[in-house]
Amino acid sequence: MPPPPLSLPLHGPAGAASVTFAGDEDVKKRVGKKLQKKRHEPTTPAVELPERLKEGDDAGEEDLVPTQGPPMFMNMNQSIFGLIAAAGSRVDFHDRFESSDDESADEGPQRDSADRSHSSSTHGLFLHRKQRRRDESDVAKTTVLNKDPYGSGKPEKHKRKISGHKLLRSLPALPRLPRHKSKKESSKLEPPSEEASDGSGFAQSQPVDEAEDDEDDKDHRLAPVMSRMLEAKAEMSARPSFDVERFSSDQLTYSESADSNDTALARRLQDIFEFDQPEAVIEEYPCWLLQSVLLQGYMYITAKHICFYSYLPKKALEVVKSGYLSKSGKRNPKYNRYWFRLKGDVLSYFKDPSNVYFPSGQIDLRYGISASVTDKKDGLNFTVVTHHRTYHFRADSAPSAKEWVKSLQRVIFRSHNEGDSVKISLPIENVIDIEDTQMLNFADTCKIRVIDNDETYAIDEYFFSFFSFGKEAISVLKILIEDASSTAKDAARLKAVQEEEDRQQQQQQQHPMQPPMQASARSSMSGSRRAIAPPKLTTNKLPEAVKATLSPMSAHSPSALSPRASMDAARASFDAFRSFRRRSLDLSTIIRDSSPRRSFSGNRRSMSRNRLDDQRRGPHQQGSTDSYVQSSMEEPSFSGMVASSIEDPSASQILRGSDVFQNPTMRRSGSASRTEVEKQQRRDPRSPPTLATYSGQHAATAGSLNDGDKQPVTPTLQSITKMGAFPLQRVGAFAEYLNNTSSKLGSMLATESMGYVEKVSGMWRGGRKHYDAPPEIKTDDEDLYEDAEGKIQTSMDRFRAHFALPETEKLQATYFGHILRVLPLYGKIYISDKSFCFRSLLPGTRTKLILPLKDIENVDKEKGFRFGYSGLVVVIRGHEEIFFEFGQAEVRDDCAVTLLQSLETTRYLEKIGDLDTEEREDEENAMAERDALKEARQTEEFHDHDVHLPKETSGVSDAPTILFDDPKASFLNFKPPQPLKITCLTIGSRGDVQPYIALCKGLLAEGHKPRIATHGEFKDWIEGHGIEFAKVEGDPGELMRLCIENGTFTWAFLREANSMFRGWLDELLVSAWEACKGSDLLIESPSAMAGIHIAEKLSIPYFRAFTMPWTRTRAYPHAFIMPEYKMGGAYNYMTYVMFDNVFWKATAHQVNRWRNNTLKLPNTSLEKMQPNKVPFLYNFSEYVVAPPLDFSDWIRVTGYWFLDEGSDWVPPQELTDFIAKARADEKKLVYVGFGSIIVNDTAKMTQEVIDAVLKADVRCILSKGWSDRMGKQGEEAVDQPVMPPEIHVIKSAPHDWLFSQIDAAAHHGGSGTTGASLRAGIPTIIRPFFGDQFFFGSRVEDIGVGICLKKWGAISFARALWEATHNDRMIVKARVLGEQIRSENGVDSAIQCIYRDMEYAKSLIKRKAGKNIQVEPDEDEESAEESWTFIGNDEPDPDMTTKKLSEMPTLPGSSDTKPLGTRIMRVSPSQQSVA
């Protein structure tokens, strides 16, 4: 037995390593202690057996066939370095510049003497504001509502300060594309709309926050002198208004002393949309925002605003949809089939759905623009357009393509909105007009055109659809706008006259000695100059701008329902409710990856950026063209590009073009908080742009991509003092560094990126790099070079882009090494705070690994496979280990320590429930916000305005995608309007009938009328559940005896059945026809043989359902023809072809005769029936049998159909006492029961079970059902062995209750029993007898949750019992699998699949009915076979195979015959690639 994995010693909080740093002498002396141990085998490690189980010979025991192949043996010596300190390296000044660390924004208290010269009140206010700002949440996420004394009385969490957010920034003032925004802005008393939002969701709460962060920034980095001079000059002019703004903003809080006359709804709307004061609510209507989708929400019409609110939660961790699609390559037009998974904002595709850690590719839908069906004829092809490229897909059916498109549209729409709700606030004074439009046939729609703000008067359009109250709502809106328009005109005229009078009076005061004529002339000239601009009288200054979390439709959009109508605008960059933790686009990624598409935002946003620049500069900045401090997170060349694209460069701009003359932009952060990580800012220096100018081809570059955040240029005394606070002791070290590493100075001054040779040499040199080292490891000086070069943020952006991870993912370290799968593959390892990733670097390879840290169990250090390499084994929960190799032992040790620390941190956060705190709080606050609005609506007079759904849209094929306020709601409801008479036809044992009882109970709950047609002995059981019963002839006991003696449906079975059961088959067919009459839908186990013909006769939809694979696939062999060894995809596929042909040829004569005589149908054949096109429901879990890659879209793996009967079952007192005694004795408790299996010698099997239980030293609950079935006639009764006290015999017990009481289960391996034991999360021992039991035994063993016995006897069974109760690895894997199975609801999934595929099933029946009308009974018609059938020059011919098989005496079901398929068939490479 190999020693247990050795975990490295962890000390300190969250598993922080205790690392000691010394000088060169200590580094040279460090030695790692090496221990030797064997490499883990890739299969489940064997547990050392006790001596009592080692003794004994099992050579005479019964061999159970088919058996599995021999386990692969691996011998890998392991070496473990126990000293963590040995992995560290000496830290000196030079080493700090070589490594890369994330910056910290929490070093504010470490201020120099110059900072402390500020007044104590200012400094104290700064600290108070800084702490308060951390606690504030942005409105983009949610409004944390105050307690309403007049409302529901729900407890409030905390009071928000409205000024903390300046809700709803001006839409045109926001960038087209996200970017990291500088916080050094002029802090003026400006309206709430005059601040842009941050591209990464880090919106500035208000100007004072920006100034505070400005102070914070300068404390954490050492800027070059030029940059600090510019910074000081810029800060001076901001200082006076800065102080005023802070004072005023601190006083501006929402008080609950609002006017008592204000309604609860008005106060809620004030909170959510941040009005200056509560506004009277005129009307409220349920409506739908119409863009590329329909979004359900509510419109609130107040005295001054038209507001729209919709609850739209994110689904970051939820798998929205999964299934198979075909995808064409970027350069290869051929379609390849993959398994796709739409999770969160990422569409991933895999070659193997069971290995979700290795995606073949990913599509980040945060960059998505549109998704649409392109093939209008067949409706199978659709595309997804992103900023980077267009992806082409093909579905198996038109409904599947439409479902995928709608799901993708929903995700794209959600990702373009910031936060968990959509909020739009349209000031009534900004509205131009309201127009009735006929956009939808089933709803009243109005178009509202609004002026974005009073800078450029850009026009936006919003479309709202009403399924009820539409005429009334539009009428109210029109009346309101007309009244507001007339009032505004009068106010504008009065204001203009008043301003002119004030101006003349002011001139008289300034020039008292001036002759009246000259003064009058001057004033008249000045007045005429103003009079030239007509907007003075017609377009007065608007009090506020349009505010929204979602980009509007452009007024120049050719079609409001264009796929790009809402996506042309960038992500939610118009988001005035900007979130602090943005989980969307990142500017640097846009700049690098999609520069050619940067002009997609159009010129309007470019103008709005210029407006914002001019607006923010204010009167103090208009005359200045001096440079402003620039801080960029981009490559050095980007800053210069922006400057040159706007104007001729001045000297100051030339200096700004190089990052060495800029403020460092990164601060190392020891915190994983996204709020701190995203304080990476950039500033864009430009001269004041002309109002409403168009930048042409630089629209996105000069406009939406740039912040335009200008700084005043007048220096202040405080900032000049700060400038001199540069620690002189650091200057010498910096100079030494420049002398010793002069080659790197060029990279700091130059604007071009790293060369190809430098990149490649660094890649092959290997090594490691840390991005988030603890503060005790690196000093404050270390981030100087890193920040100046700007590499940290770039590395994090590239890491997230490589693996399509959210922006909350924070890179911690990278390593170069090899991953070992088939051959060593060189690549790069990434460790973040939530994931462990790998990316191959060899040309021609695209291997990626994305492994969540929560799925990793442990990390072991071993010797490598190759000489001189050091190995690392990542042990994954419920998955095989993954092996890595490193060229250097210290790199391997560093990787192990970092990964173990991250694991400990993750486990600790998960334990205290703090792993996803931010996301959870966002969701809870959004729900509270939604509930508060709902409650306020109910108390108003608008409670009768309920949502009316457009039910007629179900028949509109081109209706837009619909998003519901309820995240679980869906318009994709295929439920039939009328209840159906559904018949389930099956034969076999109790395990074959039980799943149908569970399904029928679900159908009963849906309002349908189910019926089960099966053997008569199950009548009472079925009717006991309130289900109708219909009898089908046949004796399941005799059928089981035939299967055990001859194998299940083997040639020997069919040959004997033909000789002995001809009458039985005729009776089965006739009784099945009688039992199914009057049905509207037929669901059949294919072993019943009659259903497909009955459905054809009745012209009703037909489904198949079974407990084991019956559909042709290369992934698994047919469950009735399991080989002794794994034979590969070609053999697996041929087992289905062979079985279909043998099974049909053995019964074709009787079936066709029955069709002619009873059903009055012509003869048929396999080609005409096309059984593999029938929709199929598999009632097992995808976690047990992963859906094969070559399953068609109509083949569904729904999950187990469990019939839980244990809730009302009362266990006998003897049983509960036995269980309690076993627990008291601290003995393992197992269940042994082989169901209703027929055995030749019941006494012998019982004695073997007794001996095995005693040898394994366990307690056993025995269900001895095998002795209760029929035996051979004429045999004398044999005395049964006496049961020892360690065994308690029961007649029966519900599996769901019993398996929850025990430690392991041993049974025959039937599908239902296997599912029950796996759902309980306990190891499973399978002793297969016949049929699918061998298949499920192999699956249980393959996934590592149990044992499939190869031999049967007391010794083998005792060893299995002991291992199942003592193997920790197996126990943990079984527990994990149990959690996954319990999360499924197989019955509900099956019912939804029936609804979804109903039309497809009807189309098959109609097609067959049409053929029968035209075809004569004996005509041999050629029909098209399934399009997914694999055809190749090496594929065996099915007819020839059938002919050969008919000449064989028996098939692999018999124990005395060598299994079929021991010859490996030659297959083409194309066929192997599909397997």
UniProtKB/Swiss-Prot annotation:
Transmembrane segments: none
Subcellular location: Cytoplasm; Preautophagosomal structure membrane
Domain GRAM: 270-315, 798-901
Name this protein carries in UniProt: Sterol 3-beta-glucosyltransferase
InterPro entries given in the database record: ATG26_PH_GRAM1, ATG26_PH_GRAM2, EryCIII-like_C, Glycosyltransferase_28, GlycoTrans_28_N, GRAM, PH-like_dom_sf, PH_domain
Species assigned in the record: Glomerella lagenarium (Anthracnose fungus)
An annotated GO cellular component: phagophore assembly site membrane
Compositional bias annotation for Basic and acidic residues: 108-118, 675-686
Keyword Cytoplasm: yes
Free-text comment on this protein's domains from its UniProt entry: The GRAM and PH domains are infection-related pexophagy.
PROSITE patterns the UniProt entry points to: PH_DOMAIN
Record function comment: Sterol glycosyltransferase responsible for the glycosylation of ergosterol to form ergosterol-glucoside. Mediates autophagic degradation of peroxisomes (pexophagy) and is involved in pathogenesis via peroxisome degradation inside appressoria that are developing into the host invasion stage.
Database matches in SMART domains: GRAM (SM00568), PH (SM00233)
Reactions this protein catalyses: a sterol + UDP-alpha-D-glucose = a sterol 3-beta-D-glucoside + UDP + H(+); ergosterol + UDP-alpha-D-glucose = ergosteryl 3-beta-D-glucoside + UDP + H(+)
Biased composition annotated in UniProt, kind: Low complexity: 8-17, 505-531
